[in-house]
């Protein structure tokens, strides 16, 4: 069991069960939530209940098949195979080893090219926003003074965006209203919401509230309050008219309702059916 501090929140997980239903919308059941709470309550002085849970998310990871039917006993490692000329296959693995997987896959593909191809260097390439991070962190007080934002706000944004914070601060400098907190999602600036649409490829409201930010699991109302202000902020960037704003907000509300309903269900089949009442947009 993991109990991970995450800002003002704690992440508790994970379950380890098979999922044979819709792959695009895996859903946590009430039994899944109770399972995690039951385990964490063994070590807490004050027990948690489902009423204490702000948000829930579920995902899938591919496991290599084996002799056991129990997912907990299957390998978390990955394999790279070259089953046919020009075809490289990666199976298994997980998010935390994605760079090792990428290196192994590229090195395997390069072996089929012939000639002197250097090894993949992906594991040594800094992530986007990482180059110069420490120097900018050391300047966080100066960034706060220059932008008029509190230094704690700058620190949070640096941890989320790295040195790309300068792009958000440029938006704030051009429109100081974007330096205000998002109504209903005060851990984020309005400028961060606009940035999700202008620089990070968000196309729909749920892209912003559930993926570019984590507002959908960081508040008890699942970002319902923040949904319309967020939609209105990105409307000029994405070319939305009033009808599209209403449609995006309504779809997000339906998504939240479907997720909430799925998390009251006792089994996977019922949770899957509930979640699919509001599938994500492509």
Residue spans for each PLM region:
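Phosphate/diphosphate-binding loops
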Residues: 1
């Amino acid at each position: 069991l993991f109990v991970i501090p995450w800002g003002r929140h704690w992440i508790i997980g994970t379950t380890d069960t098979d999922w044979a239903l819709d792959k695009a919308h895996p859903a946590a059941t009430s039994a899944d939530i109770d399972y995690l709470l039951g385990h964490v309550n063994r070590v807490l002085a004050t027990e948690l209940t489902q009423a204490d849970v702000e948000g829930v998310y579920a995902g899938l990871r591919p496991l290599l098949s084996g002799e056991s039917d129990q997912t907990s006993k299957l390998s978390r490692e990955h394999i790279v195979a070259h089953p046919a000329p020009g075809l490289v296959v990666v199976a298994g693995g997980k998010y935390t080893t994605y760079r090792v997987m990428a290196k192994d896959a590229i090195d395997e593909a390069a072996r089929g090219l012939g000639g002197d191809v250097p090894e993949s260097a992906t594991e040594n390439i800094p992530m986007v926003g990482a180059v110069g991070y420490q120097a900018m962190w050391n300047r966080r007080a100066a960034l706060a003074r220059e932008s008029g934002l509190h230094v704690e706000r700058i620190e949070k944004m640096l941890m989320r965006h790295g040195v790309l914070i300068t792009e958000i601060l440029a938006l704030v400098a051009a429109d100081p209203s974007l330096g205000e907190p998002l109504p209903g999602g005060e851990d984020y600036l309005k400028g961060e919401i606009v940035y999700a649409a202008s620089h990070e490829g968000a196309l729909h409201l749920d892209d912003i509230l559930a993926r570019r930010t984590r507002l959908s699991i960081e508040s008890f109302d699942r970002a319902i309050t923040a949904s319309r202000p967020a939609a209105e902020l990105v409307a000029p960037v994405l070319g939305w008219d009033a009808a599209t704003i209403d449609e995006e907000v309504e779809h997000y509300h339906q998504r939240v309702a479907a997720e909430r309903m799925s998390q009251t269900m006792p089994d996977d089949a019922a949770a899957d059916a509930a979640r699919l009442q509001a599938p994500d947009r492509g």
